Amino acid sequence: MKTEFLSINDIFFLVKIGFKYVLALFNGFYLIKIVSYPNEHSIITNKMIYIGIGILLKIILIIIYWIYFMDIYILKKNCNKKFFGNIYCNSNKIIDNNISTTIIESDDFEYKKLIKKFFLKKMYYSLKKGHKIVKLYMLKIYNSDFNCYFCNTRDILYAIIWYISLYYWRRDEYNILWSFNKIPIYIYNILLILLSSSYIDLVMIIISYNKSKYHMMKSKLLIDVFFSSPSAFFFSRHFFVLENGIDIYFLMGFLRIIKVFLNVSYAKTEQSYILTNTEIKVIRIILGVLLLCNAFASTLYTIQGIHPYNIDNHDLYYILNNYLDYFYFSIISISTVGYGDIIPTNKLSRVICIFFIFWTFIWVPIQFNDLIISIFCKKETYGKLSMNNQKLILLIGDIQPEQLNTFFFESVAYGNKLKFHILTTYPINLYEEQIKIADNYCISIYIKNFDLNEKHNTNLLYSVNAQNAYYMFLFSNKFNNGHYNIDTKSFTRLLILAKFLHGEKKNAVIELRNKCVSNIVKSIGCEHFAIVNLKHSLIVKNLVCPGFITFLSNLFTAYNYNENPYYFNNSKYLHSFNFIAEFNKGSIAKIFSFAAHDNMIGLNFDKLFYKLYESLGILLIGIESSHINNNHFVYSNKKRLNFFFENVGRSMIKGNGIRDRTRKTGKIGGHKKFKFKLVYLCFLKRYIHSLSRDNCDNTQMITILNCKKNNSKMNKLNKKFYLKEIPNLLEMLNNHVHLTNKSNLSTPTWNNGIKESYKEKNIKSYHYIIDTNNINVAYKNNIPEKGKKDRGGIYIGNKHTNDTCARTNESHKNNRLRSRRSQNGKPYLGILKNCNNELFHTKKMNNYYESYRNNSNINEISIPNKRNGKPKCYLNLLGKNYFMKENDKCIVLANSKKVINYLSKAKSLFWLFEINSTKMDKVTYDLKSIIKTKQYFNKIPTSNLVKNIPIMPHMKNKSIISKHDSKIIPMDYYDLFNAYKSFRVFPQINYGITKNMLRVSYKENFNNDINNNRSIGDRSNSNSFSKLGMDKSTLSLTKFSNENSHMDSNSNDNYTVNYEHSDQAFFKGCVNWGGCNNGNTNIRENAQNEVYSINDVMNSVIKMEADKYTFEVNLNDTILVENDYNVLQKNNIKNFASIKKSNKNSNNNNKCEQIKQLNNNLTFKKNEKKTKSNKQNTNDTLERRKNGVAYSYLDACQKYFAHSAKNKKLLLLINYASNIIQLVKLINKTCKYNIIILTSEISSINIHHIYNVAFIKCKTMDDYSLLNAGLLQAEYILILPTEVNDINEINEIDMNNIILTRKITYLLKKKKKNYFINNIITELINPTNIIFLEENNMIKMTEKKSSYSDFFPYINSTQFYSSNIISETMLYNFMAHHKSFTKFPVSNSTLKCLIKDINIIYVCELRKYSDFSFKKIKTFRDLFFFLSKKCIIAIALYRKGDKYVPFYIYTKPCENCLIRFDDIVYVL
């Protein structure tokens, strides 16, 4: 039972504390008592003044150290309990504010809770708390390096004062005491100052005795205790009987010489940046022996030396001779020579001789042993461990020297004094160059050669102080990176590290070579980098966005570019100075993130964006947040039926011609209205580009409810439209548009973007689930207009989804609907055969239906979303009405100095948000015509342009239109504008069908439909399209024309095209909704009796050899249909017929005749196909077992690329790597290329039929081999390094690639007039080898040390300012940068967003045309402001230089940089 009285332990603790403080006061009392002895030279007052000066000097130095150097936990007395509670809640992510939280204090301040009703207990615990704080302060200060340097300096000064005082010592015989009466007063005053400062050190030792027990037993501390005031008073009063007590410090001054020797013997040498470890050991031995002999001589001189009173004229000469004799005697005695000319005169001298000789015998051999070991033994360690609180970075695994350079560079560039502990499997001599770099740049390192994976010994981690690591990095071996066991080793090291930390959260990053164990690593809670996938993503992104590698390396590398001196040694580089200087000026901007300040919380993102930019030149590009957005945007419209369609249509087609034309017909209800809606929805599908599967998220739905319809007329407009934004802010949406019946689904048809279902009759209600992500992408490459209203005065509520906002934390694999789709985006066959309600009525969909059934008057549909605690990256929130919240982090592009000087201080931004800045005058820009043209061009597919648009002269080798890619390359805006004006008529034609249109379709059970009196041409009466599919073996193609509205029924010239089964594994077909003009159609025949489309705007029928044709299908513009021939045969599907829209006066009999003729052709070709199928299947089976090997580029085109599109670009890959399949897969996923691999070895894996790849084998990479492989026809050339089996092969392989790069550069310049050096992508292993890529001469490293140019030269240090050079080592900037080297780190999701989700806008040659004017927009700043008004953030310019600086990146929009008309603007 607790009582109010103290226990025995408490009383003992109070006594111990009291004794410490009394002992400290006791020392001060005797210091005053010593100086208060009668002295004729000074008075007590003067002595007290000098003592006060010494104490004050020590206190000032402690305060300076406390302010600038000490980092310790301070418990403030006036701290608010609520403040600490909030901190604890935030750290543990506790949302409920009602939960009472307990303050968890540091281990240094753990004490029992105060019991308020017991007064003595309260007083005791308050005293104990205060004492622990004082003790912690004293211990921290005493053990610091700052105090050590001060004490050593004081000891040296003490020794100098003692040697000066020897001149004034007097005595006639050695058996009497020395007289110190002739010592001047200034020596006494200096001695008093030194004694008073040492008194403070002794007080710190006394108070922090328990924590400094390791320092108490040292010999240096024993000397300090002997020189304390009580011991000095005791020896001076009772042992030596001195008149002046302070004279004892002169008499025993030789002990200070011994302390100086001890300081040198055990001094720290880990931070020596001038000498090597061996040199330091040699110097320590020499200096130690000299100091030891000097201490021996000083002790003997004090014991048996004499200096008579009568020698006054030659005092200095006499004292020097006398002291030199004793120094000579000490050397003779220590070396055991013993000449006998000088001998000890008394017993005390003999005892001193024995003591020093033994001391020498022990100390000198130990030092020589360490020296021999360091010279001759194999080095397993280098450097010394960091025992203080310096920031420690631990690197574990197979770290290469170049990777270590990256970490060194980041540390030096940010000015951080970091200590690196390296636990590596490589020998230490491999890091000789890195050790020199560390010595030159004052980087403290410790290297140990040991593999953590061998013995699984966690004690090894204790030996390198892993428990004190600020950040930890684990590396994998890059050699033989195709094997699985490499990541297994790294994963095993991670498990050992996790076991060592005992669940404690540490900042750890692991490098992986593949994604085999990435999910397991993620479950452990460790951040990981799949370095190979990151490299492949950069390469593929650079194919679409030129200069992207250089741009991203500028943002993530702390490199301050300077004009390299070797550029101006030759006069030919002088004219490139402007380009180099502009690049250096624009490359200052780096990417940072900082916590939102209190003044920023609650501000709109747009307002904060303009405030930071206008005042500080800081570009805010996004936020990192873990909050749930509580802003719900709910819109309803009860009056207008086609609210959704009008908004989407107007965003895509100017004027909404379809809606106006439908109004003019006067038939809004009934079959006509529903047919319009249905056809219009399919029309929208054709022009809405879907996002990739990696960016899918089910977050936003538009739900249209209660759509009732009769057979003839539609009921009143009683629909409700809801636009719902669920809590996760602006997440990427699922690229599906679903149209599903509320009741049973029947005869579904899979579409690329839409799911349609019909009931036979009496369809009363429909349930539309339309994913707005499809609309989102339609805006993707456009410039939206903020706050624009449609013609009906309805605000377009989904404008907030216009810009690209990325989130990469959630995977599409959780989407059950998406998991049913194949990898290439096409549906599986089983989906077409077995499509039922379960496909869409998943668990999440059932929640929507239940909420609808339970509440008919529902206004909002809540979609549950699990909270994810990890920070998410949101880019470009302009126009989203996002308000800054607490704990948000702002992602900015800025100069590091601005971020540190302004954003890291609490009160520096007060004026920025409190004072209203003057608004700039609104300026009207003439660029609106360009923006509108760009909008409508992107919204209308490029494949619908009838005339071929010419391109710029330097882009002649590039195709303007890529049907499998939504990206648009630089183009001629003048012809684009003319095409746009002529294309304004497009919406007035029936749903996008122009004159010459290729129609392919079929009808199931056509005779049954005739018996039921249903016309296939009249969609208003047709509600049953059972299934759409294409025969893989044979396809009937018909050509329709609007020129002659007549069909010759007697004509036998109905041609079909055989699409053989052996040509391709499956058939890609195109079925378009819509119809032709009124009347019958005529089948046209060309001169060669071949049927194909001329200037076809929807499909391309491409002529190939042997009268074979294929479709080139735009996946975004067509309905992909595929089915098995056997399935169609079972369903009696043998007829292919055209689906044509006709008016009411059309004749159904003509349609029947057309279909009969087509069926006859189909039957004939079907029989012909059976005779050839067996032979073709046998040959096809044999060919598939072989890989695609060709002898030349032309041979590859004939054999393997014959069925691909003519406008497909060629990608030439040189050298074969083990992970090249992953790269090819990623390239084909993003941009479709015909790929030729030029290599000396052929892969055993057949990848031709999957990725359209052909191999060309060659022994040497000579000029003929390169030209034969299609070098001149290649759009991009990618040079990969060959397999590296040993680290010594790195430079050899890099040199081969560098020579090959220069050879390709020479060939392209010789053969091509318009040559882009940026189209060559070279991957190097060692980034420092890039200095040899200089075109005309090798670069010699400058003797003068420039700022980092020699240290880290791989980024843009040569004339290849923007050449596509990439290295795995360069990617370690993303691993190191913003993790442990800066106070403003960026999360890993931001990096992924920048690599995968960035888009570009091209601005080319606008000054040549009168339609566009840049009178108001002249600089990058003007263009930045104009685009920001359109919710677009411009972040960089990619521009052309001259012959020596071909291309470079400019990333500083705050400067008045004049824009040029051939610049490419990077935007978010």
UniProtKB/Swiss-Prot annotation:
Gene Ontology annotations for the cellular component aspect, listed alphabetically: membrane
Disruption phenotype: No significant effects on the uptake of the K(+) congener 86Rb(+) by parasites. No significant effects on survival of infected mice. No significant effects on oocyst development in the midgut of Anopheles stephensi mosquitoes.
Main location, first listed in the record: membrane
Annotated intramembrane regions: 326-344
Location(s) in or outside the cell: Membrane
Membrane topology: Multi-pass membrane protein
Protein name, entry field: Potassium channel K2
Lineage: Eukaryota, Sar, Alveolata, Apicomplexa, Aconoidasida
